[in-house]
Amino acid sequence: MLVHGYPDNSEVWHEVAPLLARDYYVIAYDVRGAGRSSSPKGMRNYTFARLTDDFIAVIDALSPGKPVHLIAHDWGSIQSWEFVTEARLRGRIASYTSCSGPCLDHVGHWMRARLLRPTPSSLGKMLGQLVRSWYVLLFHLPIVPELSWRLWLGRAWPRVLRRVEKTAIVPRATQTADGVRGVSLYRANFIRSLFTPRKRVAHAPVQVIVPTLDKYVSPALSEDLSRWVPQYWRREVVARHWLPVTHAARLAEMARELIEHAEGKPESEALQRARQHGDRKPLCGKLAVITGAGSGIGRCAALEFAEQGAAIVAVDIRAEDAERTAKLIRLTGGKAWAHTVDVGNAEQMEALVDWVGKELGGADIVVNNAGIGMAGGIVDTSERDWQRILHVNVWGVIHGARLFAKQMVARGQGGHILNTASAAAFAPSRDLAAYATTKAAVLMLSECMRGELAGQGIGVSAICPGFAETGIMASTVYTGTTEAQQAQLRARATKLYQLRGLKPETVAKAMFSAVQHNKPVVTIGIEAHSSRFISRYAQWLSRLIARVSMAGH
């Protein structure tokens, strides 16, 4: 059952309906006052009670013996909340997928809670929604909205949507009438619901799809509905308000997942992560794929993101290390999978991305962290050494960033990619020719990707830690040295890093902060901050420092 919003009619579902009709009997109707339905005069004829009677009449006629799966948008979604919380309809709605239309009673309680216990954050969210709802005040003015529709807006509506919403629609013969008559929906229901809200609890499974670029409905309105919805899923899509028109296939796919689950199939991994509970952690419902997760920064990032609510795919070239990380997460109550991959191998990375997409529904966060250390000058670094470090430090990041970014764009749900660079990206060094080169490449790649993917709702961060105690020094290759010399240099470097005391847990927390605040470049440690400062404002000093050998060989 498809219920349209304002100022639309059932034609808004012309892209969605055929996709669902492959497997289901699809019903779409014009609500009263829209399309070919009757338009009774008087505001009292547009109350929720009358709209509910209409809905019952439709399902009595077309699905009298079987509950319907409800999908609604905008004002159709607002009134459908009435249906899914109405005692008369208990058992007649099998599931409800809502898009861009909250329950007005829930909004009333939401506003009360923020006024009674105000905080800067809660008041900011409430004021943000009030600004988005400017048109509601306009619709309560006498005559003005009706005149606007009759004089110009009815004819101009397709052009207005194209300019303001970047959404193309086909002009409709009933557009002016739909706009004029539908104003009564606001006048008959808004004030009563917001100022004297009822306690409305859903009696069917509910999935709320949130277009993150919606100019009219804030994502904050759907953040905490577990009080009202015992079975609740929440999913975000990087899209504007008119999702049935612009992202019909994605909307149909998400609705289908809930329908299939309501009909008895197990939850898909993506749907399972979207299930909401009372105590919601910041990354609840997100899937994070982390390379180099078997030790050091990668393992700490996996544990930190899991602690914040994310499900984890721990990726490492060593199977036992990846499994150890996954096991640690499971022991703390998290969800994790282990995967063995050589990140520099394109085919293996493609297989990983394909598996994540098909089995888990796609990644929300990707941490391209796998890397190796290498010290030595350009003269001592052989072609084989270059091939090895480029394979992991550069190609590993390129494969992970490119392939997962492509998946994120196709999903349309945004995401975040973190690429682990280093303080060495800012500081030329005679002792770190190959390593610093690869990390500078990662930094520039991250900056380029950030510019490219911003419009898709995908953030990209370059993580640049200083001398973190990760164990990388114990495996660093010192070019141009004997095995005995390498052992001495590794032991010396490891001791220095331990004395520095920058823990990988600190880097992991900085990674989480980068995701939360969409930071472009994250420097961790005084040496990272100072190297970045010098590279910007004292390049002569940076070049002078580059001449100093710190390797002692």
Feature map (PLM): residue ranges:
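Conserved HGGG/HGGXW glycine-rich cap/lid loop of the alpha/beta-hydrolase fold
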Residues: M1-R36
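Substrate-binding pocket helix/loop in short-chain dehydrogenase/reductase
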Residues: W13, G377-I378, D385-Q387
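Flexible "cap/lid" subdomain of the alpha/beta-hydrolase fold that forms the substrate-access gate
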Residues: I27, A34-I71, S77-Q231
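Conserved glycine-rich cofactor-binding loop
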Residues: L287, G294-S295
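Active-site helix of classical SDR
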Residues: A401, T438
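Residue(s) in the substrate-gating loop at a strand-loop-helix junction
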Residues: S422
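SDR active-site lid
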Residues: G455-I526
